[in-house]
Amino acid sequence: MRCPFCGNADTQVVDSRVSEEGDTIRRRRRCLSCDKRFTTYERVELAMPSVVKRDGSRTEYDAGKVRGSLSLALRKRPVSTDEVDSAVARIEETLLASGMREVPSEQIGELVMGELKRLDKVAYVRYASVYKSFEDIGEFVEAIREMQGPLLPGKKLRKD
């Protein structure tokens, strides 16, 4: 590590501490030439995978697009911004944990649907209708049935 004061490359680590979150190491260093001390921080830098679109083109992952998709589906629904941010973070953690360098956009769409299913069932059906390109009312009905899960014995769906 170069000294920020004199530019000398010979420095010595005097003290190292892990942050409370456990994701950063703080190091106190001393320059062996000018004897001045300085602090450095070390943390893992993880790269999000590239996104492979349906047409085969590739683009950088954009958390803003994921957040926008979630927010649009959740528009006028009782879900807080913090819950949306947490959903985006879970999607990103899943993508990073996969270790993949490239991920199909369809996989991100499925992750978004999973988060919406957990957050708000109406928003899930909204998103699914666009994402899966519903063509008729039957596809909406099927998505709603999927959300309701198995019927209890003796219960029937109303056909109104």
Curated annotation (Swiss-Prot):
Residue spans, zinc finger unnamed: 3-34
GO terms under biological process: negative regulation of DNA-templated transcription
Molecular function GO terms recorded: ATP binding; DNA binding; zinc ion binding
Record's keyword terms, sorted: ATP-binding, DNA-binding, Metal-binding, Nucleotide-binding, Repressor, Transcription, Transcription regulation, Zinc, Zinc-finger
Cofactor note (record): Binds 1 zinc ion.
Listed cofactors: Zn(2+)
Start and end residues of each ATP-cone domain: 49-139
Pfam families in the cross-refs: ATP-cone, Zn_ribbon_NrdR
Top-rank taxon: Bacteria
Known function: Negatively regulates transcription of bacterial ribonucleotide reductase nrd genes and operons by binding to NrdR-boxes.
The family this protein is said to belong to: Belongs to the NrdR family.
Protein name from the UniProt record: Transcriptional repressor NrdR
